[in-house]
Amino acid sequence: MALHITLLDGKLHDRSGFSCGIAALDDYLHQRAGQHQRDGIATTHVLTDNTQPARILGFCALSAAQLHLSELQQADLKRLPAYPVPAMRMGRLAVSAAEQGKGYGQLLLGHVVNLALSVRQTMGVRVLIVDAKDAQAATFYERYGFRTTTSKALSLYLPISAA
């Protein structure tokens, strides 16, 4: 089995067969992801394997964003202009209930960080923002270096460095 992460393709990927156990995330993939992608609101990246390329193992949704300076931790304010910093937002991250515990969330997150680093080469991206659904999700992101914003405990960001 070889894993692949690609953009959602409504003609190829079976969105209706996906269930992560969280209705809001399932509904987004089933009902809004395709439209958001067509309208330029967000892109949805899906994890599949070559043995069943239509079956979605996990997904994440990305969009452009900004983060106000007042939401950054003090240590992250160095050498920044006096206006919001450019960001990439990962609005959703979900793994199929049948596939949880296999490291697919970590794989998708790594994909997003690599995309942010790549985008940074062509336009400004200072941080990757996530809005965790609950404290357990926030803990997942904190394990990978995300920091809570000063305004909300479930809103986190990861500084994207050029290194």
Describe the function of each predicted region.
Residues 1-35, 39, 55:
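Short amphipathic alpha-helix that is part of the acyltransferase structural core
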Residues 40-64, 71:
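Conserved beta-hairpin
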Residues 91-101:
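A short, internal acetyl-CoA/4′-phosphopantetheine-binding micro-motif in the GNAT/acyltransferase core
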Residues 101-115, 143:
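Conserved acetyl-CoA-binding loop-helix of GNAT-fold acetyltransferases
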Residues 109, 134-137, 153-160:
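Short glycine/proline-centered loop/turn elements that form peptide/ligand docking sites
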Residues 117, 123, 131-151:
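Conserved active-site alpha-helix within GNAT-family acetyltransferase domains
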